[in-house]
Every structure is written in structure tokens, then in C-alpha cells.
């Protein structure tokens, strides 16, 4: 009986946290993402794979889905299109001759993004956490 009570108590304490975790990346709160791996691509050559910082990309980006902003290295770009689709936040924008498209998993916080410009493209993979 004591073992059952301990399991029940553990479940009762953890269940609210699990419910909150599932709603973490629903777009209601800003979050910060670490860009981990990136691929730098150009026509006619193989893509270069490396850490985002090695490819001179920002290490961190701040995303405010409600405020429709995407910020890195002191620069802020407007999010022109934002949607929640099948458990993912999806948003796009453009600035300085480049377009970006980013997807963040609502439950995982995993980020996949692409930036495209004239004869160049970057694909990035990262992980996000909520802003305290």
C-alpha cells in the first residue's frame, strides 16, 4: 500500500508539469533558440556542414510569435506569416534580400529553419527554451 501511495503522489506532482510542458511552445510566450547545426549551400557545390557559429550564423535567436518578431545579434526582423499547423509553429519573413522560414515543434521545441538569398541558402537545426 505504501508503494502505491508513493507512485500516486509522484504522479500527482508530475502531471501538472507534463500538462504545462505540452503547451510550452504554443506561441503564447516568447522563446530563445540555440542554432546548433547548419548547412551552407550554393549552386553547383556541395553544402558545407558545421556548427552555426562556425558558419558565421548567430548562436541564439529570439522568437516572439505573438509579437511577430525574430531577433538575433541586435537585429530584429518582422514575421510576415505565422501559423500553428499539426503541432508546429511555422513562420516566414524576409529582409535585406533574404527570406526565412522556420518551424518549431510545439511539444519538442526543436527548430528547423532555412534562409535563402541570391545564390545562397542556409539550413539550420536547433533547440528552443522559453524566455523566463
Model-derived segments and their meaning:
Residues 103, 111-123:
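Short, exposed beta-strand-loop hairpins at the edges of beta-sheets
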Residues 18-22:
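Sec/Tat signal peptide C-region and signal peptidase I cleavage site
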Residues 59-61, 99-106, 126-130:
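Hydrophobic/aromatic beta-strand elements that line small-molecule binding cavities or substrate pockets
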Residues 65-100:
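Contiguous, well-ordered beta-strand patches that form the walls/edges
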Residues 7-17:
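Bacterial N-terminal signal peptides
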Residues 1-6:
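Positively charged n-region of N-terminal signal peptides that target proteins for export
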Residues 51, 118-132:
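Edge beta-strand at a domain terminus
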Residues 27-66:
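Short, solvent-exposed loop/hinge segments that bridge or flank secondary-structure elements
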Amino acid at each position: 500500500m505504501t508503494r502505491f501511495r508513493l507512485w500516486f503522489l509522484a504522479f500527482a506532482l508530475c502531471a501538472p508539469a507534463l500538462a504545462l510542458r505540452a503547451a510550452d511552445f504554443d506561441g503564447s510566450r516568447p522563446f530563445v533558440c540555440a542554432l546548433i547545426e547548419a548547412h551552407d549551400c550554393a549552386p553547383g557545390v556541395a553544402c558545407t556542414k558545421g556548427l552555426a557559429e562556425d558558419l558565421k550564423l548567430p548562436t541564439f535567436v529570439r522568437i516572439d510569435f505573438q509579437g511577430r518578431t525574430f531577433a538575433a545579434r541586435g537585429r530584429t526582423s518582422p514575421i510576415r506569416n505565422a501559423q500553428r499547423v499539426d503541432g508546429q509553429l511555422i513562420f516566414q519573413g524576409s529582409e535585406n534580400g533574404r527570406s526565412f522560414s522556420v518551424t518549431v515543434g510545439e511539444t519538442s521545441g526543436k527548430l528547423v529553419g532555412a534562409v535563402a538569398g541570391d545564390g545562397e541558402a542556409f539550413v539550420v537545426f536547433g533547440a528552443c527554451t522559453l524566455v523566463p
